[in-house]
């Protein structure tokens, strides 16, 4: 049976919550949303997901503008070209490179 992204997300959250109880640690899930439609991000945010990762700057900027939600924490994932540093720093809270 093929799980849709909502069911898959809920399964992952259940596993994370079990590990949090056992290990008494804070675990933060970053959902990589590159190439995905912005409506999926909105749906996951409604379920409590706050951290989303992108590595295509132009695509990410479009999503950030379309969604316009201050509760979402945007993560830039991947290599950085020097000519894009300013735009990345203006749009993302975290950089993972």
List where the protein language model places each region.
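Conserved alpha/beta-domain cores
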Residues: 1-97
